[in-house]
């Protein structure tokens, strides 16, 4: 059984910045990503609802972007009229930044 002297102090204060990440999309468009816990939980709940209702994937992605970067930035992204692969890549990048997985190596599951 562990006693009080077996534990050490772990300082994570340097890892907590409380700053929102930013993503540069074009030279003219940089967005701030709302990666707050409650916002991500709301997106996850929305994903479950969309899945139950078999809603349109694009409608979900657009609503998710609005929640992550705001309606104004989402409107600017929509105005770009990106090809679908680039739109999905943009969405996946912003979502990856929001949940902290951007830049991690993606390996296919077996």
Label the model's feature ranges:
Residues 11-14, 45-48, 59, 75, ...:
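Polar/charged alpha-helical tracts
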Residues 1-45, 109-110:
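Short, charged/polar N-terminal "headpieces" of proteins
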């Amino acid at each position: 059984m562990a006693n009080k002297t077996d534990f050490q102090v772990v300082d994570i204060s340097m890892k907590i910045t409380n700053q929102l990440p930013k993503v540069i999309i074009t030279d003219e468009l940089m967005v701030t990503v709302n990666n707050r816990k409650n916002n991500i939980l709301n997106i996850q709940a929305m994903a479950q609802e969309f899945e139950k209702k078999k809603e349109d994937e694009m409608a979900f992605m657009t609503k998710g972007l609005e929640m992550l970067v705001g309606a104004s930035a989402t409107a600017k992204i929509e105005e770009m009229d990106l090809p679908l692969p680039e739109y999905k890549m943009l969405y996946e990048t912003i979502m990856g930044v929001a949940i902290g997985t951007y830049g991690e190596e993606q390996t296919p599951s077996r």
